[in-house]
UniProtKB/Swiss-Prot annotation:
Pfam families documented for this protein: Ribosomal_S11
Family recorded in the similarity comment: Belongs to the universal ribosomal protein uS11 family.
Annotated GO CC locations: ribonucleoprotein complex; ribosome
Gene (name only): rpsK
Native organism: Cereibacter sphaeroides (strain ATCC 17023 / DSM 158 / JCM 6121 / CCUG 31486 / LMG 2827 / NBRC 12203 / NCIMB 8253 / ATH 2.4.1.)
Domain of life: Bacteria
RNA-binding among keywords: yes
GO biological process per UniProt: translation
Assigned keywords, A-Z: Ribonucleoprotein, Ribosomal protein, RNA-binding, rRNA-binding
Job of this protein: Located on the platform of the 30S subunit, it bridges several disparate RNA helices of the 16S rRNA. Forms part of the Shine-Dalgarno cleft in the 70S ribosome.
Binding partners and assembly: Part of the 30S ribosomal subunit. Interacts with proteins S7 and S18. Binds to IF-3.
Protein name per UniProt: Small ribosomal subunit protein uS11
Single annotated GO MF: structural constituent of ribosome
Length: 129
């Protein structure tokens, strides 16, 4: 017999003052996740969820819009100060940082957590355009 699952309320308003913003910027998209200090997600957004498609997802403007959206949702839960962890080589890193600061969140530290291979896997071949 299948057990009944207990479901948590999804949009329940939390009161969290400090958190961590994880900015994952790849060559194709930029994702922003704002979590509490333990790592539980508070809000998230990406360039794709903001309505950008294809190569427009990788633009700095799309990253800015996604960061503003995630920051607004986090501020609804009482978020005031954040640490920022930036990951990836994409073009949306700087603009996402600026958008988080402009949204009214107080940034205490910025950390680059991009994984660096110590001669690991062979990288993809060069593009011939």
């Amino acid at each position: 017999m299948a057990r009944d699952k207990t479901r948590m309320k999804r949009k329940e308003r939390k009161n969290i003052a400090a958190g961590v913003a994880h900015v994952n910027s790849s060559f194709n998209n930029t994702k922003i996740l704002i979590s509490d200090v333990q790592g539980n997600a508070i809000s998230w957004s990406s360039a794709g969820t903001m309505g950008f498609k294809g190569s427009r997802k990788s633009t700095p403007y799309a990253a800015q819009m996604a960061a503003e959206d995630a920051a607004k949702k986090a501020q609804d839960h009482g978020m005031k100060t954040i640490e920022v962890e930036v990951q990836g080589p994409g073009s949306g890193r700087e603009s996402a940082l600026r958008a988080l600061a402009a949204a009214g969140l107080n940034i205490t530290s910025i950390r680059d957590v991009t994984p660096m291979a110590h001669n690991g896997c062979r990288p993809p071949k060069r593009r011939r355009v």
